[in-house]
Amino acid sequence: MYTILISILIGATSGAIWTLLGLWKTWQMGIVLGVLVSGVSFVLISRWMAKRVEPQFMAIQKQIQGGQTQLAIAQLEDMMPLTRWQVLLKGQIHAQIGLLAYASGDEKRAEEHLAKAGIRATEAKLAHAALEYRKGRKDKAREALDIAIRANKKQIMPYHVYAWMLAKDGDRDAAINKLVEAEKVESSNESTQENLSRLRNGKKLNMKRFGMGWFGLQLEKPPAQYRAGQGMAGRKGFRQKPQRRR
């Protein structure tokens, strides 16, 4: 990352100048100064880059909302050179391209980008798991869900998607255990309580509470009232926020 390298260079230069000038506490203070200057430089450069890319993100968001999916993907791909400068930006761009491609039915492109999405891009990890599951690569699907849960432990939906896959494959006990893990994260969550009860009573999981966040994964056909929705790829923002608990 250029931002990190430049910040280190600025910090090292500051520390070296301090030491060579023989100022207070010479090299010891030079090291401290170098670290501090590097940190400040990193923050300032990162903020400058964020301000530079924000207008592009806003323009892309308008394209997504206007249904111009292919144009939005092209614009996101054009932003890839900027990932050399901004930490975490690459994973965010891959996540958004992957989600847009998956929602539009371009599974080849979706698979390529979803696999490279940042670990905290929960929706992208869920879409990647769903894609792998639909293609019969169930071990890879569970691996993607494991990553999503480790990186976003307080988000409930990954546990439910995992439980759905386990139950679908006939492993009801493992599905119950996965939702018990979710219950430990948030004991009052109604979705978890309902689905635990359904599993223990031999019923199918009810994923409707998750809305298009669930149906956008294309693991179940959405009811008629959801089909007019935009799907998960049209959601605002590039960094995923936890769902509101009911």
PLM regions and their residue ranges:
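Helical anchoring/docking segments at protein termini
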Residues: 1-52, 223-246
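Terminal, low-structured helical/coil segments at or just beyond the last alpha-helical repeat
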Residues: 8-13, 182, 188-246
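N-terminal topogenic membrane-targeting module
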Residues: 24-31, 37-108, 112-115
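Solenoid-like repeat scaffolds
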Residues: 43-48, 78-86, 114-121, 146-153, ...
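Alpha-helical linker/edge segments of TPR/alpha-solenoid repeat scaffolds
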Residues: 51, 68, 99-109, 136-144, ...
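Residue-level signal for cytosolic alpha-helical hairpin/rod architecture
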Residues: 53-57, 126, 176
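Alpha-helical adaptor scaffolds
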Residues: 83-157, 161-164
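Soluble C-terminal extramembrane regulatory/interaction domains of multi-pass membrane proteins
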Residues: 157-203
